[in-house]
Amino acid sequence: MRCTVFGTGYLGATHAAGMAELGHEVLGVDIDAGKVAKLASGEIPFYEPGLRKLLNDNIAAGRLAFTTDYDAGAEFADLHFLAVGTPQKKGEYAADLRHVHAVVDRLVPRLNRPAVIVGKSTVPVGTAAELRGRVRGLAPGVNVEIAWNPEFLREGFAVQDTLHPDRIVLGVQRDSSAAEASIRELYAPLLARQVPLLVTDLQTAELVKVSANAFLATKISFINAISEVCEAVDADVTLLADALGHDPRIGRRFLNAGLGFGGGCLPKDIRAFMARAGELGANHALTFLSEVDAINMRRRSRMVELATVACGGSLLGANIAVLGAAFKPESDDVRDSPALNVAGMLQLNGATVNVYDPKAMENSRRQFPTLNYSTSVSEACERADAVLVLTEWREFVELDPAGLAGSVRAKVVVDGRNCLDADRWMRAGWRFHCLGRGAAAHSR
């Protein structure tokens, strides 16, 4: 089977390579000639474990190619995926759909035979219905169906999530005649492994993704709110989360108290969800998401407060090592990164900040050029008054506190992700600070 993928960023490149791995012929289309040239040569412009090999294997097999030519994309296949970004509008909560509209406006007039356009991008509910009207005006007389197949990729696990998904959701038009059959053929290898396929209307499929992200964000902010109470009474939020997680109705995943969530999805998606609910007159239904967002942002301020305490009450003149810049481990994504945000606030409060991340240094320099960047943990920690672990890379979790002691000026560590073994660090003579554990971390 043949398909095209319009947009070759994180989502598009992963989907294109994944569909080629399933045995299909795939053409990735993007207006960015530099990005297309990199991908065509087997390079990916971001870090994602396993994706480069997947890309190169399928280019070599002749199943995957990339182009800037929309005419070639329109001619290549009758199944077209939209995988462009939907960022937050500047100064607003709403999603910016200009990239989605641009692809549709360029592609559809070039279609001269029946086709199915399938959205992968995260969009406000009602977008697919709006695109249906747009398509009818752009290609009168040509049967072009709109469908929605939301992605559920986790950065750092995108290849796994593409080739071994938990479920496949497909939203189709009520009068659809081709979309479901096309998707069943495309995903046949996955369906043969009993991956569930849920076929819905368009608006339900659009809501599935944003609802999933809203729920995950709520779960993270819930445990972070509880961690504030734990700090007030010297309880241990990690033990509390373990106890909650044994309840099968709750589960342990996403109950990791710490610095909170960031990245290019959860923050902007819950804000866009709130904005869309307001447009639909259902704003009261999602007011709780405002508090979810507020709790999440408050964690960053709380980390600065904790660092200030760790440095004796003032950051002025303090030398602080920040370990972690990506918003999560196994990624180089620094969009709305809590770690970088905290590093910037520390600098604004008078500290000299030295940042190290195994994969996100280049992106970090572009976003925060005024910070100091180091090439290793030991360099970042040289003569540090405090070491802050803000992204839970394995390299940081497995640090040897005794070995690191020779680099720092003061043996003070602040665990922003509750990922370190507190007892191990304290036995090595370090003062240990963390979020949500109060004195409990010092008493075991």
What residue spans do the PLM features occupy?
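Structural/interface elements that position substrates and couple domains in central-metabolism enzymes
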Residues: 1-444
